[in-house]
Amino acid sequence: MSALLEVEDLEVSFGRTGAVRGASLKVERGETLCVVGESGCGKSVTSLAVMNLLARGARRTATRMSFEGQDLLRLSDAGMSKLRGNDMAMIFQEPMTSLNPAYTVGSQMTEVLRRHKGASQRVATDRAADLLARVGITAPGLRLGQFPH
């Protein structure tokens, strides 16, 4: 059985600036990996590279990058989109950039539920409101219609 996630010799650069050089990791099923390092050392860039969410113009290479045996280096954008949010996710460091200010909180939360869980708009909206209430956000129905800022 292959590892859940395997990355071998990851290199990421932005133009001529190297951001990650030779990163390798292996995560087996049931394991948790904690990546610790100084600010700017490449922790987030490594995660973004695995998720194929790097900014346009970034260059990503690796000897091997697989998730559940699937070659992430050869997977199409549509294939990566199916994995992200359902099978593979990232908790972003900066909460102010986790939600896009151009879209309502509700549209961003329900998109995930509709795309990955096949929920109807009504079911997704009810679930999103429930999730907001569970974490202590007041007036969740109202908040779903607001823009993050």
Predicted segment positions?
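ABC transporter nucleotide-binding domains
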Residues: M1-H149
